[in-house]
């Protein structure tokens, strides 16, 4: 049936079967009108989203920039930056994994898990796949966070007993580098050659002091005075300089 005919005096337009047509009375020719609607494509636009409330806790970009290790809802995922396959590398609904960190050589992903009842370090071989391997055991407190050494030979973590612990994930051994029972060691970071550490910790007067620590000699050296509140140390990429923040404006 023809519905809703309308004319401008020259042509007649009407609806039939859900489509619009135009009729030329002079020629009695009828033609379907094809309609294309422009759109702002609101739902196709890129959008920045806060996914923190949805369970994501950390992410680490692979050295080649092609994939990310993401921890979300207690699982570790190997996720492509662009198109590709997303892999759940833990599959452990009974435990909580977090702090996934890609090794600088791109071969491994290290993370913290509590499947044993205490937090331990785990290692996943990216190329080989398979199950992650537990590389520490019999831990006696909560691990705060971990990081790889730049040479990809060790994993460093801090814990609630205010220790800095260095782990050899391949030999499955660990050693306590330093412990400060009174205060938490903060801003811990390796030097680019993996031979030094830098960190900050409060002095007795509560001012934060920056230190460097030589791993070979096991010696600690203060970099700043206790009269200034200094923190957030980081090595320059060539390892020649130490950069930090310091509050030295007295008013």
Residue ranges and their predicted role:
Residues 8, 51-60:
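Signature of short aromatic-glycine-proline-rich micro-motifs recurring in repeat-based ectodomains
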Residues 1-3, 13-25, 36-44, 52-53, ...:
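A flexible loop/linker signature enriched in serine peptidases of the S9 family
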């Amino acid at each position: 049936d023809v519905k809703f005919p309308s004319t401008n005096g020259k042509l007649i337009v009407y609806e039939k079967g859900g489509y619009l047509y135009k009729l030329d009375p002079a020629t009695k020719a009828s033609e379907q009108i094809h309609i294309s609607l422009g759109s702002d494509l609101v739902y196709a636009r890129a959008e920045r989203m806060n996914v923190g409330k949805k369970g994501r806790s950390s992410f680490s970009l692979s050295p080649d920039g092609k994939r990310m290790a993401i921890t979300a809802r207690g699982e570790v995922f190997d996720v492509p930056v662009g198109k590709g396959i997303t892999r759940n590398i833990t599959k452990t609904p009974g435990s909580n994994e977090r702090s996934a960190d890609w090794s600088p050589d791109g071969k491994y992903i290290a993370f913290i898990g509590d499947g044993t009842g205490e937090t331990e370090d785990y290692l996943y071989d990216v190329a080989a796949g398979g199950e992650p391997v537990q590389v520490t055991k019999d831990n006696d407190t909560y691990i705060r966070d971990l990081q790889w050494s730049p040479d990809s030979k060790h994993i460093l973590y801090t814990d609630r007993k205010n220790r800095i612990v260095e782990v050899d994930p391949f030999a499955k051994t660990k050693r306590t580098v330093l412990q400060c029972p009174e205060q938490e060691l903060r801003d811990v970071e390796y030097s680019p050659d993996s031979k030094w550490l830098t960190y900050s910790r409060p002095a007795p007067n509560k001012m934060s002091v920056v230190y460097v620590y030589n791993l070979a000699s096991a010696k600690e050296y203060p970099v700043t005075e206790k009269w200034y509140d200094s923190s957030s140390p980081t090595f320059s990429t060539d390892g020649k300089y130490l950069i930090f923040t310091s509050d030295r404006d007295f008013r």
